[in-house]
Amino acid sequence: MWRTVLVIFSLLYAVCAGAVTPGTDKITLSDLDNVIRNAQNYDKVREERLDSCRTALARSKSLEQRCLIYFDMRHTFDRYRTDSATFYALRSLEAAKALGRPDYVGSSSIALAKQYQTSGMSYDALATLNRVDRSGLSDKDKEEMYLFYMSIYESLEGLSMDKSLKQYYSSKAREYKDSIVSQFPDNVTIKSESLVVEGDYKSALEMLLKKYESLSPEAIETGPVDIAIADIYLKIGWRDAATEYMIA
């Protein structure tokens, strides 16, 4: 149990200690399983993590340090206190703009859009993404943003009752899917779809499960990969397995 606490603490402590920049943290599935089994310990460590961040924030001597701390506090609050997470996402974005760092602005904008989507504010998420200067994004951030766009439009398509709107959202989702295929041909979510069309469910599952294990829970790719895995399990009739990957 204490190994779990130490693992979590080391993962959560990194940015406030100055060791991590946006988008670099990874959590293995075994670590995540241990976190779920020891949820009470995780809550305690998370509060300690936030206290550490607050202390680091009070002692910070540069805008860049504050930007990274805000970014990490947003991540720590994610799905825990969404209002606090949104607050720190906004502070991170403000600091990134003041720094004039396009890479930080891109990462912070995507993080803020994610908070809006988590809160059910799809249109605010889209508006935030639409303001991002794509020329300043890394290839990784651009791929994640396209996946996020696709995910939002697919979600809106499923929720819309208006036929013309459903068609519009569907066309936008396809547009971003096509962009991913052309610009990021190694994207496993898209490649797995081709394997499914060919009837090779085994290879598609192996590819997706391997990718899933490499992702941190908060990674934007996690949602599309979850959905793709669940869809394959449903297609082959493994409903119990599918429920493990269905996301709310």
Regions found by a protein language model. Give the residues of each.
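A "functional boundary" signal
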Residues: 8, 16-248
